[in-house]
């Protein structure tokens, strides 16, 4: 059945023009965060004279790698999982560490010369995904997922959304009027919209609030800090058409030891994201196409991106929020967004024009998207009847939430002179899994309650019943 309760699983019923519009909506949802990563990374590689890398991470390469990586992920996942892979923020600490390396071969390097070695470390990090995928394939996904009951995955999904909340507020605070316009338009179209408009509230929020930004800009209004609402300077200088400036990565053991361990954190995030998407869509992606396949897709996308000078890729919560809001679960729509990203990478001027989207609008949109992700986590807990009157479940949830929200800057420690950073979500996931394994009194065993598994979108028994 393709449609029930407003859910659409085959977007082809809408026709190609409407599918293209839905693809644009997903592209806009990921765009702001995806292009922010190369901007932040390049800021770490500015030398004492204020000179940055001559060929740092670029927006064009980042967009190409995000789009191509998403298509590769869908191929590995048998075209079944509606996930978009954008730039990962988890490796920012690793980039900063490599930028500050001043021993061995890095002693006489400029900042720009160090950057390819950081990318080389990410290539190895991506290959570690394949190792975990092999382990899961050998031992079976059921045994792995028994360590992730609703008492663990629910709070983790809540943290995925709430950990992004400060970013939404920070962006919105640059111009609260624009942010409220974007948020208000999304709410209006989602609640009162009819037909096609009801399933593209994010796109409508972006378009209408951008029109408002244009009016405010040319009327002489400014942001809260006095800066211009719109800045077209970069778009005026770049060429209309051009190849993304790819550059090959380089390898060094020190840089690998900095970047590769971060994969532990991102793999835990991947499992949380797959659980969130499964719960959102109501399909068991952990079993079919299988967690090992999604890990392979994510790992290969990350390695290939870094191999040619791009950032690591990761499944994007923003697009999960769009799925929940639009109720259109067709992976074809995500693939259209990926194709748009690849096409944009060859048109730097168009990419720059989209980059003029004010931070306040991104913040207003994020209010809805990030909140939706957390709401999915709450629903995960409620629908599975997680008993929070039991001390065991309460302790697990409490520790996960505090770790996920408290370690906002991650946890950095040094091993053998190498600085390693675990993200807040990785800390929360590791803490939750360990507590679930150690504490007595388990009241939920994975695979034994078909209805509970179905509520999570993780019906592990359907394969046995065929």
Residue ranges of predicted features:
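Interfacial segments of multi-pass membrane proteins
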Residues: 96-100, 190, 319-334, 340-344
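Membrane-embedded alpha-helical modules
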Residues: 100, 110-219, 338-448
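Membrane-embedded hairpin module used as a gating/binding unit in multi-pass transport
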Residues: 34-35, 209-221, 225-306, 310
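Intrinsically disordered, low-complexity non-transmembrane regions of multi-pass membrane transporters
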Residues: 1-21, 223-245, 279-283, 294, ...
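Membrane-embedded helical hairpins/re-entrant loop segments and their flanking transmembrane helices
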Residues: 42-74, 261-331
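Short, non-helical or kinked segments that cap or interrupt transmembrane helices
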Residues: 57, 79-91, 144-153, 198-204, ...
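N-terminal signal-anchor module of multipass membrane proteins
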Residues: 1-82, 93-112
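Hydrophobic alpha-helical transmembrane segments of multi-pass membrane proteins
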Residues: 24-28, 148, 152, 172-173, ...
